[in-house]
Design a protein with these regions (language model features):
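Beta/alpha (TIM)-barrel catalytic core signal, keyed to glycine-rich beta->alpha loops juxtaposed to Asp/Glu
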Residues: 1-204
């Protein structure tokens, strides 16, 4: 990891990125890929900004990005995800529930990014839950399927601790989400108007 989340400051993160390129780590991986010894180079990080920086310095095939493109967080649409499309970089997306609240809803002590969700996040999720309820759709299904609307996202890791949770994740992913739900979320300003939707991606295939 070379991100701020892992190292606690932008300065240390920047130093780790420089180390990757200055001390030959990236060069060695690039040579292995060129020789056919490995097929791809990627990084697992918690922030899209460092992914964008890495793409400015080298040729990466993909990133495992945790929790930075969700129903609650879409800043990656500004520049990073369009860059991924342009560079043919695939995203494996972890943390589609922002560590809990998009799965549990706005329950007492709901978790948002590993901490107690602040009031403004709780209110936003309540509004999302109301839209989902009006379409007889669980919030968790909307949260899991939303992220797959972007063509840079190749797969999603919702997390599971048992076979039962794996089966539950499959059921959530297979839940039918009406197109009108996405339209209502957009209409109420709960997701960005430029956020691509699962129905749009399916129609483009």
């Amino acid at each position: 990891d070379v991100d701020v989340f892992s190292h606690g400051s932008q300065e240390v993160s920047d130093a780790k990125v420089r180390e990757l390129f200055d001390e030959g780590g990236y060069r060695a991986l690039d040579e292995l890929r060129s020789n056919g010894d490995i097929s791809a180079i990627g990084a697992g990080v918690n922030e899209w900004q460092v992914c964008e920086r890495l793409l400015g310095l080298g040729d990466f095939d993909g990133f495992l990005l945790a929790g930075r493109y969700t129903l609650l967080e879409q800043e990656a649409l500004d520049s990073f995800l369009p860059l991924c499309i342009k560079r043919d970089v695939g995203i494996i997306l972890g943390g589609p529930y922002n560590s809990g609240i998009l799965a549990t809803g706005a329950v007492p002590d709901a978790k948002y990014n590993y901490d107690i969700a602040p009031p403004h996040i709780m209110e936003r999720v309540r509004k999302m839950e109301a839209v989902c309820a009006s379409h007889d759709t669980p919030l968790i299904a909307a949260a899991l399927q939303f992220v797959m609307g972007h063509s840079a996202v190749k797969t999603v890791i919702p997390g599971a601790m048992s076979p039962d949770e794996v089966r539950a994740n499959v059921a959530v992913f297979q839940t039918s989400v009406p197109d009108g739900l996405w339209s209502d979320l957009r209409g109420e300003g709960l997701i960005r108007p430029d956020a691509p939707l699962p129905s749009e991606r399916a129609n483009a295939v």
